């Protein structure tokens, strides 16, 4: 298989605290260039350009730039979105507000929920299609034009056209979209069935509303970034990460902007799947601890788990395929505090990039997880990134003592240790959510730890959860950026049938699968991005008649038969619930096809590139320092420079492994080895305590 070595390849990921860049550059020392710069919240494009400059990368000399952005996610969470109007079927304007049976508060007549589109911007027109796609009421075209005029007068920038049962017959929606664009060419227009051709009008409507609300925001951002790159000589197509773990050409990204929500965590899981599988661990739990939060995911047989049900917040379900990631508010910048009851809390509030942890010297005054690691000797105060004004360890310890230690009657060191214990407990809970809660024993997986802070906590987390192996990739602090580099192009398609197998026309299933694949192939070819091949992954959503929950069933290549569908569903249902229900009819609900443009593989060894390798592990030791460990207290601990470790280097804990983008803690009783791809493989003595 060929390797992507022609030219320079750049992956750049924007996180809540840092913007990370990796450039595979054959002309650079070690074949790689790296950068980590503070995220520019006001305009993320500035941070991307700053990262290129910091890495010494000339955009005009780059073969491909792949970008992961939090623009859409942040816009939704902060409600800094475009003013959006809705044109919907008469009688259904309040679907987006009524939702399902859940409510933001358990008691009271009102809650704090505010729909993404306020009621005065939700307008109705006469039209009606039934669930079989039959037209009951013709589309009132004059009503559509009147609604367009009203929304324009109300200051809308974006419009959603969302009609009942449009998944079964798109004719009315398509005609209405034509009318909107003719009457209002400058508006951003979203058709619900184009974003999600699936039943359930509430989820389809909210997903389309999210797309419309962030579409102008993402388009403006990508235009700014593309313009800045062009000024620096970049003439190729910019690729953008999506939440499904694939990439899309920037020119198409804004049309389906909702697909970029949660793309940052997805890129990390994609990199983890790529790297862990190559290291011999196709089953892995991913653990990404950054500056603001921690993201945990599951990889099974080398593939990340994909789901299509994300509730970004109450009343905002997003039903497009996304890498399944569980997020908690525990990152390096998470603030530790004493609550009203006198108890120690850690997160979810974060110091962010500004002012950041106390030790960054940017004016931060609240103790964070990073500050606790510094006080306990796990971080080197002289090698912290992005420090504006140096702050001594004693200064940080004094603040932890005053804010945490004194109220609890603890020393500064004891208080810092307590901060780490609580943070680790929260992270262990997240791991249990993606493993035990879904029928997977974490002891059967490796823990793949990355992010700027992940390797600091990974071995303690593995010990707590009895996970026998920890994989620390070559560049843990920029793994999300590496995910951008290794990700394939991807486009997802869905159609609803919602038909019992006994009544199903299997030829219709085959036809829809072929149409989905053809649409994906055409889109990838239109993107004009070099790929080795195009492949399709098919799956179906099924349930037993009368059930509300749906089970995703993967299909092999080729066209499935009815007996094959029934057998695969029965097997999947047994594996998930250990129940057989032969007396109830199975129902095929949705057909899914993911079409991937497989890009040339990236040689992982290039990511570990270094011209500083020593002959032995001992020669890579650059010093020693006093480090606190659970159960033993302070130990005089060797510090290894990771860039100097030779391939095959093996050593026992306690140890600190320092590198440009992260610090790894190896606990007493654990052992580590560096493999050929630069991964640090840690063996945890399960059942032993330190």
Locate each region found by the language model.
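Conserved phosphate-binding/catalytic loops in two-lobed NTP-binding clefts
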Residues: 183-207, 466-482
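Glycine-rich phosphate-binding loops at beta-strand->alpha-helix junctions
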Residues: 163-172, 242-246, 422-423, 445-460
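N-terminal glycine/serine-rich phosphate-binding loop of ATP-dependent small-molecule kinases
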Residues: 1-84, 137-159, 173-178, 182-192, ...
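Structured core elements
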Residues: 11-13, 20-23, 66, 75-78, ...
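Conserved phosphate-binding loops in N-terminal lobes of ATP-dependent enzymes
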Residues: 11-14, 18-22, 33-44, 63, ...
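C-terminal, non-catalytic interaction/recognition modules in large multi-subunit enzymes and RNPs
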Residues: 4-6, 14, 142-150, 154-155, ...
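Glycine-rich phosphate-binding loop of actin/hexokinase-like ATP-binding domains
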Residues: 21, 26-29, 33-40, 85-91, ...
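Short, ordered loop/turn segments at secondary-structure junctions
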Residues: 89-91, 164-166, 194-195, 243-245, ...
């Amino acid at each position: 298989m060929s390797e992507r070595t022609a030219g320079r390849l750049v992956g750049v990921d924007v996180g809540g605290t840092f913007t990370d860049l990796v450039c595979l550059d054959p002309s650079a020392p070690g074949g790689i260039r790296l950068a980590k710069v503070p995220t520019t919240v006001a305009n993320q494009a500035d941070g991307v350009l700053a990262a290129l400059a910091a890495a010494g990368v000339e955009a005009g000399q780059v073969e491909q730039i792949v970008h992961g952005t939090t623009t859409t996610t942040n816009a939704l969470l902060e409600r800094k979105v475009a003013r959006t109007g809705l044109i919907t079927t008469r009688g259904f304007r309040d679907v987006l507000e009524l939702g399902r049976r859940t409510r933001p508060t358990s008691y009271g007549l009102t809650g704090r929920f505010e729909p993404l589109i306020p009621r005065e911007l939700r307008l109705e027109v006469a039209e009606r299609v039934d669930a079989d796609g039959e037209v009951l009421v013709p589309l009132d075209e004059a009503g559509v034009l009147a609604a367009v005029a009203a929304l324009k007068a109300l200051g809308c920038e974006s419009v959603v056209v969302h009609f009942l049962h449009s998944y079964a017959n798109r004719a009315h929606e398509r005609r209405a979209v034509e009318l909107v664009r003719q009457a209002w060419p400058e508006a951003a227009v979203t058709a619900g069935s184009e974003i999600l051709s699936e039943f359930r009008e509430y989820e389809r409507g909210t997903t389309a509303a999210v797309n419309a609300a962030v579409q102008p925001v993402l388009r403006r951002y990508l235009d700014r970034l593309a313009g800045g790159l062009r000024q620096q000589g970049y003439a190729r197509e910019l690729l953008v990460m999506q939440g499904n773990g694939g990439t899309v050409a920037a020119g198409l990204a804004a049309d389906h902007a909702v697909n970029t929500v949660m793309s940052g965590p997805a890129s990390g899981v994609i990199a983890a799947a790529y790297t862990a599988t190559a290291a011999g661990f196709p089953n892995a739990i991913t653990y990404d601890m950054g500056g603001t939060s921690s993201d945990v995911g599951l990889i099974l047989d080398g593939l990340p788990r994909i789901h299509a049900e994300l509730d970004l917040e109450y009343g905002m379900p997003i039903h497009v395929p996304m890498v399944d990631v569980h997020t908690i508010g525990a990152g390096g910048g998470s603030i530790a505090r004493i609550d009203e009851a006198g108890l120690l809390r850690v997160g979810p509030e974060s110091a962010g990039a500004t002012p950041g942890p106390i030790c960054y010297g940017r004016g931060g005054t609240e103790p964070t997880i990073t500050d606790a690691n510094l006080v306990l000797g796990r971080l080197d105060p002289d090698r912290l990134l992005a420090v504006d004004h140096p702050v001594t360890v004693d200064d940080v310890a004094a603040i932890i003592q005053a804010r945490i230690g004194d109220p609890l009657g603890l020393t500064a060191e004891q208080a810092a240790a307590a901060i780490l214990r609580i943070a680790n407990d929260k992270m262990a809970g997240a791991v249990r959510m993606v493993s035990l809660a879904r029928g997977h024993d974490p002891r059967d997986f490796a823990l793949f730890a990355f992010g700027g802070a992940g390797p600091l906590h990974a071995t303690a987390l593995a010990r707590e959860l009895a996970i026998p192996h920890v994989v620390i990739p070559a560049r843990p602090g920029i793994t999300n950026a590496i995910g951008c580099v290794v990700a394939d192009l991807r486009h997802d398609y869905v159609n609803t049938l919602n038909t019992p197998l006994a009544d199903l026309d299997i030829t219709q299933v085959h036809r829809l699968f072929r149409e989905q694949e053809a649409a994906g192939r055409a889109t990838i070819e239109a993107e004009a991005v070099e790929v080795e091949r195009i492949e399709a992954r098919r799956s179906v959503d099924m349930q037993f008649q009368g059930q509300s929950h749906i089970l995703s069933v993967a299909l092999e290549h080729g066209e499935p038969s009815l007996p094959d569908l029934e057998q695969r569903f029965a097997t999947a249902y047994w594996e998930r619930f250990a129940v057989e229900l032969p007396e109830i009819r199975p129902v095929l609900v949705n057909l899914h096809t993911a079409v991937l443009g497989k890009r040339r593989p990236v040689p992982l060894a290039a990511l570990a590139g270094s011209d500083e390798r020593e002959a032995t592990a001992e020669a890579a030791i650059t010093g020693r320092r006093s480090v606190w460990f659970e159960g033993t207290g302070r130990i005089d601990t060797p510090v290894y420079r990771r860039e100097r470790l030779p391939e095959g280097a093996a050593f026992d804990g306690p140890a600190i492994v320092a590198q440009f983008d992260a610090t790894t803690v190896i606990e007493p009783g654990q052992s580590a080895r560096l493999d050929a791809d630069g991964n640090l493989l840690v063996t945890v003595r399960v059942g032993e305590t330190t």
